[in-house]
Amino acid sequence: RIRGQAVRCDYTVSMQYGKTGCFQFPGSSLSGKIFIPDISIPFHADCLKNPDHENHLGTWLSTPEFIKKLLPRRPLESHKGDFGHLFTVCGSSGMAGAAMLASMGALKNGTGLVTSCVPSKLRDAIPGQVPEIMTLSPPECLEMFEEKDSDFVIDRSHKGSATVLGCGLGIHSRTTEFVRTLCREITSPLL
């Protein structure tokens, strides 16, 4: 919470280290572009390296550059199949975006292969937007998943390293039974 008054900035300069309030809402909405100049405080200063020090910062800013250093580089000879295969069971009539966003998020986060199991009315919408996503549909599943689709989905889920279930499925009672069955029967890690 911002106490008192605050100025909406185009630029903020935060000496040596970013201040938490500049990166979290609501302060982030007022900070503008943030610059953090080095003013020669050594990183090994006691207040930084010792969590028991009374002035220890206790927080770290995760920037894309910081995260990139933590992630292993993929070998040049690797194949997309080396990085997992996610099976998503998502979507219903009017909810193609939920299935697409779940699958796109998996690809963006490094999953090698993604297969999206959706009702047949949604099946052509996804590859048209994101050709990397493979799609399939249970026979006779037009607009929403039902209990009769569970065997088809369970059989195909075993091809994936993990399964995502739920994005945009809706709340129809027939879909609820389908979800209960999948939660009991799918043996791969289920999200």
Where are these regions (language model features)?
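Rossmann-fold NAD(P)-binding glycine/threonine-rich loop
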Residues: 1-10
